[in-house]
Amino acid sequence: MRNWRWLLLVLAVLLAWLQYRFWFGPGNSGEVMMLEAQVAHQTQDNEGLRQRNQALAAEVKDLKDGEAAIEERARSELGMIKPGETFYRVVEDAPLPAPASPETAAPAQQAPASTDPVDHP
């Protein structure tokens, strides 16, 4: 009977020590949850960067292999045209200012109030 008590005491101390390490020791459950959240965030960032890299790789491949992409960039960014083409630029007139109505023009014609900081009786 006495051996059972010692065994039970040793097991209780061992359980208490393991629980302490689980909750408060190095690599505790809170730290593990924080690291899992960081891993999830980093995975999300990596996926975005992977998609960006794929788009850039496709653009590089298109620029190396195809003339259509180079021609499109030359036309849109540099304003270039092919020989024999005529370039037309359409410039719209600036909108005319709206005429001032008599109500809005009247306050502007009034004399400004005195700017003298001293009050006169």
Curated annotation (Swiss-Prot):
Places the protein is found: Cell inner membrane
Ranges annotated as spanning the membrane: 7-24
Keyword check for Cell membrane: yes
Pfam family, one: DivIC
Origin superkingdom: Bacteria
Residue ranges, compositional bias (Low complexity): 101-121
Keyword flag Coiled coil: yes
Topological domains, Cytoplasmic: 1-6
Region (Disordered): 94-121
Mode of membrane association: Single-pass type II membrane protein
Quaternary structure and partners: Part of a complex composed of FtsB, FtsL and FtsQ.
Function per UniProt: Essential cell division protein. May link together the upstream cell division proteins, which are predominantly cytoplasmic, with the downstream cell division proteins, which are predominantly periplasmic.
Name of the protein described by the UniProt record: Cell division protein FtsB
Lineage: Bacteria, Pseudomonadati, Pseudomonadota, Gammaproteobacteria, Lysobacterales
